[in-house]
């Protein structure tokens, strides 16, 4: 979700804040983020803001591979966010095309509730993660973004 339209970002942050607050109200204290640019890092910032008033909250960074962690640590802002995490999990040492799927699978397997920002596309990492969340029978909180892309079979018929 690095390519989000600017006008959607504030709406997404508001919706993420709402879902985080709802999770805290429901008793959740541990949150995970894959630390991708964009939505993942907005989520991190919002959880860490809430940690200031709710010290029991924990954030775990789930990083797909070692060089990604190295590149995050080179930027002051993301290094500070990582340092504020209770734990940093690196899924595998070397990059392989499947690293992001493995990271997402790890987060779903270790979660009771998944919060997903989703544009409705049937392909891609978010769609795959949502399908896996359903298969694992985990609770899913979906935040729609942008123009929702409808699959062809759901589009209105035009004459």
Predicted regions and their residues:
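Acidic/glycine-enriched connector segments
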Residues: 1-157
């Amino acid at each position: 979700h690095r390519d989000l339209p600017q006008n959607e970002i504030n709406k997404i942050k508001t919706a993420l804040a709402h879902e985080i607050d709802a999770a805290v109200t429901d008793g959740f204290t541990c949150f995970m983020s894959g630390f991708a640019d964009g939505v993942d890092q907005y989520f991190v910032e919002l959880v860490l803001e809430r940690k200031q008033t709710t010290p029991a909250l924990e954030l775990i960074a789930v990083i797909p591979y070692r060089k990604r962690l190295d590149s995050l640590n080179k930027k002051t802002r993301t290094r500070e966010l990582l340092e504020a995490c209770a734990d940093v999990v690196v899924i595998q040492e070397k990059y392989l095309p499947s690293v992001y799927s493995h990271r997402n699978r790890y987060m779903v397997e270790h979660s009771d509730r998944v919060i997903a920002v989703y544009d409705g596309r049937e392909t891609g990492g978010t769609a795959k993660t949502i399908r896996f969340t359903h298969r694992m029978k985990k609770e899913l909180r979906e935040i729609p973004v942008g123009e929702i892309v409808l699959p062809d079979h759901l589009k209105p018929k035009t004459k």
